[in-house]
A protein has these predicted regions:
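Conserved small-residue
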Residues: 21-23, 29, 75, 102, ...
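N-terminal glycine/serine-rich phosphate-binding loop of ATP-dependent small-molecule kinases
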Residues: 1-96, 124, 152, 227-235, ...
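Active-site core segments that coordinate phosphate-bearing ligands/cofactors
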Residues: 10-12, 106, 113-126, 134-136, ...
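A structural motif corresponding to the C-terminal end of an alpha-helix
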Residues: 198-205
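Structured loop/turn residues at beta-strand edges in well-structured enzyme cores
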Residues: 70, 204, 380
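Short beta-strand-loop/turn "lid" adjacent to the catalytic site in phosphate-handling enzymes
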Residues: 63, 67-100, 126-133, 164-185, ...
Length: 481
C-alpha cells in the first residue's frame, strides 16, 4: 500500500446481493484497499435476507482490505433502502429482513393509502405515496400474517441502521434512509405519530435520527472487525443518497443508476410531494431533497432474459416491432406490483438479439418516463445524464440510454459510488467539510461524455402503447409469482 496523504476512512455499501468496503485516503479520494462478500436472498413469494449475513459479509470484506482497514479513523455505512429489520430484546433478528423488492405488501400499501387520506395526503405529509417497497407496508403485512413476530420485536431498523448499531451499540438512522420508511414525515422532519399509531408501531422501537454532519457514535468493544475502539462512525444513509454524496451532486444534475433496481434522481432545494406516487420525495443525506423514481427490474431482469436466450448480455440487435416489458419481479414504476414479464410482437423472423434489445428498451423506457418528473422545472434538459451503477459500464446499456433519452451521457470512471459516498461522509467528520464538497474535491464524476443522438420516439411510443393496452392484464398478474 502506498503512503496515504491524509487519514484513511472506510465507506461501506451493503446492497441487495453483497457488501462492499472501500478504504479511502480522505485527502485525495484514492481507494487504497477494497473487499466484497456476497449475500443470499430468498426466492419464491418474497425477498428476504438474514441480517446476520450482512455483518458476516462486512467482516469478510474488511478482512480482504487487510491492514489498511485497521488504520481507518472513521467509517460510514450506505445500504439498500426500505428493508424491514425486526430485532428482539438481545438485538438478534426475530425473522429474516423483508427487502425493498419484496412486494407481498402491495395490498397493505393500497389499504394504508386509502385509510390515511389518499395519495395526495400521503405525498404532502411524508413526501411519498407508499408502494409495496416502503417499510411501513411491510410492517403492516407482518402484523397481518405474522403477529407473533411483531410481539417479539423490540427494535425496528433499516439495513444500514442494523450494521451501524452493531458498530456503536446505539440505534441510529439518518433522514435520507428514514424518508423511505413511510413513517417519517418530510413536512416536519420527524416520525409521524399518527401513522405509527395507525399501524401499531411504538415509536420507542425506532432509531434516533442523526443530523447531517453529526457523529452517530464510536466503535465499541466486543466486535470482530478490524476497527479500533473509539473509531468515529458517521450517520450513514440509504444507497441512493450515498451515491448522490459520492457524486458530489448539485441541484439539477440528473442521475440514472442501473443496478438490480433502476433509479433516476436529482438533488433539489424543493421538498417533493408527487400525489401520483411516481416520484418518491426522499430526503438526501445533507439537508436537501432527493426526488427519485425507482424501477424494480433493471440489470438483473435483463441479464435473466439474456440467460434464457443463452446470449451474452451485449449480443443485441436492432429491434423491429417487438416489445418486451421485463417486469419479472412485479414493478414499481409504473406501479404494477402484480405484473410479470410481457412480450408482444413476436414474429418468425424475430431474433434472440432483438428480444434482448427489447428487454433493454423496456427497462430504460420505464426510467426515462419518470425523469422529467424528478427534475425541477428550471433544470437544464440538455445537461449530460450521469450514468452509474453496474450496468453503466455496459455498451448495450449506454447506447440504449443515449438512443431513448436523446441526451448526452456521462459515465463517471469512479466505481462503487455508494461506498465512495459513505467514505466521503466519514471523511467529512474528520475534516469538517460537507461530504458533497469532499466528493467534488475527489473529482468523482470525471469520465467520458457520450454525445447526444436523435431520440428514438418511435420505440418510446410503441412501448407506451403496449403498456397502456396491456395494463389490465399486468394489474391482474398471474396466479403464481
Amino acid at each position: 500500500m502506498s503512503a496515504a496523504e491524509g487519514p484513511l476512512v472506510v465507506g461501506v455499501d451493503t446492497s441487495t446481493q453483497s457488501t462492499k468496503a472501500l478504504v479511502v485516503d480522505a485527502a485525495t479520494g484514492q481507494v487504497v484497499a477494497r473487499g466484497q462478500a456476497p449475500h443470499t436472498v430468498s426466492s419464491g413469494a418474497g425477498r428476504e435476507s438474514d441480517p446476520r449475513q450482512w455483518w458476516d459479509a462486512l467482516s469478510e470484506a474488511l478482512r480482504q482490505c487487510g491492514d489498511a482497514a485497521r488504520e481507518a479513523a472513521a467509517v460510514s455505512i450506505g445500504g439498500q433502502q426500505h428493508g424491514l429489520v425486526t430485532l428482539d430484546e438481545r438485538g438478534e433478528p426475530v425473522r429474516p429482513a423483508m427487502l425493498w423488492n419484496d412486494v407481498r405488501s402491495a395490498p397493505q400499501a393500497r389499504r394504508l393509502i386509502e385509510e390515511l387520506g389518499g395519495p395526495k395526503a400521503w405525498a404532502e405529509r411524508t413526501g411519498s405515496v407508499p408502494g409495496a417497497s416502503f417499510t411501513v407496508t411491510k410492517w403492516a403485512w407482518l402484523a397481518e400474517h405474522e403477529p407473533e413476530a411483531l410481539r417479539a420485536t423490540k427494535a425496528v431498523r433499516l439495513p444500514h441502521d442494523y450494521l451501524t448499531e452493531r458498530l456503536t451499540g446505539e440505534g441510529t438512522t439518518d433522514r435520507g434512509d428514514a424518508s423511505g420508511t413511510g413513517w417519517w414525515a418530510s413536512a416536519t422532519e420527524s416520525y409521524d405519530s399518527e401513522i405509527l399509531a395507525h399501524v401499531g408501531l411504538d415509536p420507542a422501537l425506532l432509531p434516533r435520527v442523526v443530523r447531517p454532519g453529526e457523529v452517530a457514535g464510536t466503535v465499541r468493544d466486543g466486535h470482530d472487525l478490524p476497527f479500533s475502539k473509539g473509531t468515529l462512525v458517521a450517520p450513514g444513509t440509504g444507497d441512493n443518497a450515498a451515491a448522490a454524496l459520492g457524486l458530489g451532486l448539485r441541484p439539477g444534475t440528473p442521475v440514472m443508476s442501473l443496478g438490480t433496481s433502476g433509479t433516476v434522481y436529482a438533488v433539489s432545494k424543493r421538498r417533493p410531494a408527487d400525489p401520483t406516487g411516481t416520484v418518491a420525495g426522499f430526503a438526501d443525506a445533507h439537508g436537501d431533497w432527493l426526488p427519485l423514481a425507482c424501477t424494480l427490474n433493471c440489470t438483473l431482469a435483463v441479464d435473466r432474459v439474456a440467460a434464457l436466450l443463452n446470449l451474452d448480455r451485449e449480443a443485441v440487435e436492432p429491434v423491429s416491432g417487438v416489445t418486451l416489458l421485463p417486469y419479472l419481479d412485479g414493478e414499481r414504476t409504473p406501479n404494477l406490483p402484480n405484473a410479470s414479464g410481457l412480450l408482444h410482437g413476436l414474429r418468425h423472423d424475430t431474433t434472440g438479439g432483438q428480444l434482448l434489445q427489447a428487454a433493454y428498451d423496456g427497462a430504460v423506457q420505464a426510467l426515462l418516463g419518470a425523469l422529467d418528473l424528478v427534475l425541477d422545472a428550471d433544470a437544464d434538459r440538455s445537461a449530460p445524464l450521469l450514468l452509474i451503477g453496474g450496468g453503466a459500464q455496459g455498451t448495450a446499456w449506454q447506447q440504449t440510454v443515449r438512443r431513448l433519452s436523446g441526451r448526452p451521457v456521462q459515465v463517471p470512471e469512479a466505481k462503487e459510488l455508494v461506498a465512495l459516498g459513505a467514505a466521503a461522509q466519514a471523511a467529512g467528520l474528520l475534516t469538517g467539510e460537507d461530504p458533497g464538497a469532499v466528493a467534488r474535491r475527489w473529482n468523482t464524476t470525471a469520465g467520458p461524455v457520450l454525445e447526444a443522438v436523435e431520440r428514438d420516439d418511435e420505440t418510446l411510443a410503441r412501448i407506451a402503447g403496449v403498456l397502456s393496452d396491456a395494463a389490465p392484464l399486468l394489474e391482474r398478474g398471474t396466479s403464481e409469482k
